Amino acid sequence: NEGPLGYNFPKYEERANRMRESLEIIRRLLDGEKLNYDGEFYQTKQAKLYSPPKNHIPIWMAAGGPKSANLAAEYADGVMISVKDPKDAYEKVIDPAKNKTKELQKDNLRLHTYRWTMFAKDDEDAWEALKSWRGLRAPNRLQEIDPAALRETADSLPKDEIMSKFSRASSIEELKEIYHPLVSDFESEIVTI
């Protein structure tokens, strides 16, 4: 979203540091603090929520790799994971987040998992249904500004390569098979279909 607004997309280290500061500010404000904050990226002076929440508001953070998983475990209440390959999601996100949670002696790691799934009768139907979403899994999607260019990139790749980035179901039973492991194996508190 930065590119269309004329901003450069920062490298991961800066994005992570910005997220860390943001989460710290948000949590402290939600907890009722009158906040003076002087960070590298953000500053506040006497910031306060004058209508604070009555109950704890959980902060969820998406993570796609071990660094973000550690950041989520430390600063958020839960981690959101896009599961393409369940084994890969466990190794790259869930295990690091759980290990960081144990290291910090926290007991509140909550999981929200989701999968990009097409409900289609066959591959042709699925390919057509994916038309406006194909670029979502194209290479360089974090650097490219124009969604149309991402779709063109995706359309230039072998169809199977793009289709393999999504799950496909043609019946409710197949849909259950795709999503059941997110509950049974991952123990997700929230599963998005």
Where are these regions (language model features)?
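Active-site-adjacent structural elements that line small-molecule/cofactor binding pockets in enzymes
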Residues: 1-193
